[in-house]
Amino acid sequence: MKKKVLVGMSGGVDSSVAAYLLKQQGYDVIGATMQIWQHDEEFEEREGGCCSLSAVDDARRVCDKLDIPFYVLNFRDYFKEKVIDKFVQEYIDGKTPNPCIECNKHLKFDELLRRARGIGADYVATGHYAKIEKRDDRYLLIRSDDDRKDQTYALYNFTQDQLEHTLMPCGDYEKTKIREIAKEIGLAVHNKKDSEEICFISDNNHGKYISEAEPNRVKPGNFVDKSGNILGKHKGIVYYTIGQRKGLGLSLGRPVFVTNINAKTNEVVLGSEDDIFKTELIATDVNFIPFDKLEKEIEVTAKIRYSARPAEATLIPLPNGRVKVIFKEKQRAITKGQSVVFYDDEIVVGGGIIESII
């Protein structure tokens, strides 16, 4: 009997080809798009977001072409609770969150897997660029063959059970090959551009989005230097992130960068570029994949943001499941709320949320 797989379809080329590849491999494939959009006309009219209305239409057409069933699953309330509300609160708290990581953790590989099991599916699958392998008695998450498109940074929260029941067929290919396959089999999405912005923010202006969502909690305040001297006025801490230089609206006769955001005092601290280079951080909400718990100090490479190159670092276990990360070389703009992800060569060791910078 064929193994059944529920493929999360975004309407893009990657998940479309993932569904095709799995059908070719002999799986009983079902396509599904997570309905996450809110009751918002601008949101619903938006083109190209990963789960927008146009994405649903694209996904449905792909499933028709591949001759597989297609469903739209209502994740609206769950997405708001687990992703949007947390995103807004984190910015109000002076942090810079990564909503894609939360979506992967709570929706795509947790709730979607539960829904898949509810219809008798053995697996969920996505178009992510990453690989899953079983070595000895442990499932591992491995970097994609396409280094530029590798998405493991956003996938470090996997449990062993989730890895055992997840398929990622695009991880064995480069993006150019995925587009070639889509064109060869006649998929109209073969040249659809990649979605890079936050899917639920139509103009990619997160500050405006949060100000409209919580108008009473976003207030102007002071730009200050590290000694507390007032340098000017800011329009609300949600508009800024560590390392930011542009868009400050200040003319001080020298380049200044955001070095800290203090939610308690509603202040944005500015300093020189040297001030944003640090070597140590504390991470919380940590998950490890090759082992359950960090028992001793280990050497890894680590990324502090999606676009960063992995840098040599030491992991030191701390109480309450937290870890200290010490980089060999200073890192630019380590940011609270972002994730730090650990690697052993191509293997994802794990990751966590940056809680503080030392």
From Swiss-Prot:
Primary subcellular site in the record, as a coarse category: cytoplasm
Enzyme class, UniProt record, top EC level: transferase
Listed GO CC annotations: cytoplasm
Annotated catalysed reactions: S-sulfanyl-L-cysteinyl-[protein] + uridine(34) in tRNA + AH2 + ATP = 2-thiouridine(34) in tRNA + L-cysteinyl-[protein] + A + AMP + diphosphate + H(+)
Pfam families: tRNA_Me_trans (PF03054), tRNA_Me_trans_C (PF20258), tRNA_Me_trans_M (PF20259)
Disulfide bonding pattern of the chain: 103-199
Key word Metal-binding present: no
Region of interest (Interaction with tRNA), residue spans: 149-151, 305-306
Domain of life according to the entry: Bacteria
Keywords recorded for this protein, A-Z: ATP-binding, Cytoplasm, Disulfide bond, Nucleotide-binding, RNA-binding, Transferase, tRNA processing, tRNA-binding
InterPro entries from the UniProt entry: MnmA-like, MnmA-like_C, MnmA-like_central, MnmA-like_central_sf, Rossmann-like_a/b/a_fold
GO molecular function: ATP binding; tRNA binding; tRNA-uridine 2-sulfurtransferase activity
EC number(s) on file: 2.8.1.13
GO biological process: tRNA wobble position uridine thiolation
Site description Interaction with tRNA, residues in chain: 128, 338
Subcellular location: Cytoplasm
Binding site for ATP: 8-15, 34, 127
Catalytic residues (UniProt): 103 (nucleophile), 199 (cysteine persulfide intermediate)
Family: Belongs to the MnmA/TRMU family.
Protein purpose: Catalyzes the 2-thiolation of uridine at the wobble position (U34) of tRNA, leading to the formation of s(2)U34.
Protein name: tRNA-specific 2-thiouridylase MnmA
Organism of origin: Clostridium beijerinckii (strain ATCC 51743 / NCIMB 8052)
Phylogenetic lineage: Bacteria, Bacillati, Bacillota, Clostridia, Eubacteriales
Encoding gene, per UniProt annotation: mnmA
